[in-house]
Amino acid sequence: MAEDSSIAATPAPAEGVISKTYHEVTQPFIDLWHAPRALWGVNLAYTIEGLSYFGILTYLAIHFSDFVFKGVEHSDVWSHEMVMVLTAGIAIAMVVLGFVPDKWGVRRALILAFVFLLVGRIIMSAAPTVLGLAPSGIWSPLHLLTMAGILLVVIGYGMYQPAAYAAVRKFTNPKTASMAYAMLYALMNLGSSLAMLAFLLRDDQFLGLGITGTFWVYTGLTLVSLLSTIFILSRKTVAEAIDRAKAETEAMGAAAQEAAAKSGEQKSKDDVATGPRKVPVTAWIILGAILVTAYFRLPEPGNYAGSLIVLLIPVVISLLPARMRNSTIQWIALHPLADPRFFFFIFALMPVQTLFTYNWLVLPQYISRAFAGGWIGEYYEVASNANPILIFILVPVITALTYKAKVYNMMVIGTLVMGASAFILAFGPTPITLLGYIVCMTVGEAMWSARFLQYATEIAPPERAGLYQGVAQLPWFLTKFLVPLLYSGQMMEKYCPADGPKNTESMWLIFGLIAVITPTALWLSRGWMMKGFKVKHEG
């Protein structure tokens, strides 16, 4: 550890920490109060949608396993894969539909997104209630109609998230943009934390709506989001906000910034023209991983067809005309994933990022089953949704306490704290261990998540920082896809079934062993990762 003697953060003066923390916690609300009407239109709907999305997500695995797939063998496995369709599907949809706000305008994109979200949630809610569809196995009318609703939600959210951020970008100038983005993040956490109170709607001791009835409440909130967007974000309001932001940006020297951006683009083009023409080893690693996944996870005979397609990719590239082949290889060689340090960094984070997916795939079912018969199990929404409000509070506190710490060191310590949290639940399901897990995981997340994109930016060539930030999100998408596909449903079925003996200690021990791969890998590779870090793109 001699090489990392700077891991411990230099403590800030007490008054400075308190002042900085108070500022970070209260500033989003101050900014919200003074925000222009256009940003109010975005922020209000974003807060409500945070509650609606995460509220439904909390119940979704339980809704499928205990209701839609009632009596079906391996219902936990099937339910987790259905949740995967939503979460991974949204990640894909955002890539595919990200052009909508640019082409049609942010107001139209937001309204259209909420229409899709509303119709999708109406279908999900109406299938077992208004239409009276009963559980009758896999691919039953109830299952198919619920999935149809989810697919509409996927399309809607695929447009909504890019549109919300595009709106903030268009309604702000370079000076106020970071404040507006921070406000969105804070309000999303605030909105999603309100799902803690959903038991007041669901539980028989209160309103007794059940899960399907609570879905209707979230559907109604989606209608509120749609109407608020239509009336607050009027055409006149949007036009005035965009014109004002443009004028402010021009006054701040937008022309100089555009010239710098063009210079960066030209440099990037020059780099491409003279770039390497050798396929990097990282590309072969990715191809091999896709091949293994296709062969072992696709059902026969699809696994053979999928594997063959993967194997044909390099063959097809090699048979392309020389100019096209060279351009393709150059694109691969200059892609951020061709950078071995960046490749290692983002994929090394995947094990600890699996803990994020457990928040909706595992925790609601685990708490309701392992703590059955008590207050915690009955009102599982409280513990399942405690993370967002804790993140809202802890991120500015920990940022203030560790602002002098090195970014990479914070990544190592933060992922270690977060990964180790799973071992707490390996001691058994008790109120103390559950509280310890939630707090420890959230503290760890607050330590490293804020530094993640910062490190991804610093490791990137200056003119390609945005591209590196975008690609850095890839492992997060992969965990949404791979965790339910590979093991989360099987683990619940084996160690925490709805009925029968449970062994949740072993389940969380395995989860912990997976998660701590990240800090172990980051620490063991620290010398290589930091070697030439500050000068790797100079010269």
Each model region followed by its residue ranges:
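Symmetry-related core transmembrane helices of the 12-TM Major Facilitator Superfamily/SLC fold
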Residues: 212-231, 282-287, 306-314, 502-527
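Glycine-rich segments within core transmembrane alpha-helices of 12-TM secondary carriers
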Residues: 178-203, 219-225, 471-487
